[in-house]
Structure formats: C-alpha cells, structure tokens
C-alpha cells in the first residue's frame, strides 16, 4: 500500500449533516453510524454527495473533509 492510499491515523474532522465532528483514523461509515446511535435504523447516507449502500458502510473508510449527510425514513400519513 503506498502513502496516498494509507488511511488517516490521527484525529480528523468531517461534517455530518452540516455539523463538524471529529473522528479517529480508520473510522468507517459503519463506525460513525454506531457512534451516532443509528445502527439498525432506516437511514440513507451520502458521502460527498454519493449515496453509500448499507452493504458498503463497513468498507467505506472516512477521510478528513468528508461531508456526510444522513437521512432517516419517517413514516406517517
């Protein structure tokens, strides 16, 4: 693995629904979902405007400056 593909190891900042949040290097989208208490909920997530399927959350490693948008499905009528 070359230096350009190494994950960030120290603390870094991302944006979650427009709010700054600090994470530690190697944090995946699944890690973020767990930290936010959203595991198992009906949500849709986009990182830098690209929708990330639930099956890819564990593999999607977050990077400094990523913009994460999380939408939760709400039922009603």
State where each predicted segment sits.
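Ubiquitin-like/PB1-type beta-grasp interaction modules and other compact soluble beta-rich domains
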Residues: 1-76
């Amino acid at each position: 693995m070359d230096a350009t593909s190494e994950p960030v190891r120290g603390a870094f900042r991302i944006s979650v629904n427009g709010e700054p949040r600090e994470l530690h290097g190697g944090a995946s989208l699944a890690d973020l979902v767990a930290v936010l208490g959203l595991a198992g909920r009906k949500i849709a997530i986009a990182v830098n405007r690209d929708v990330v399927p639930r099956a890819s959350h564990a593999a999607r490693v977050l990077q400094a400056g990523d913009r994460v948008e999380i939408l939760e499905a709400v039922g009603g009528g």
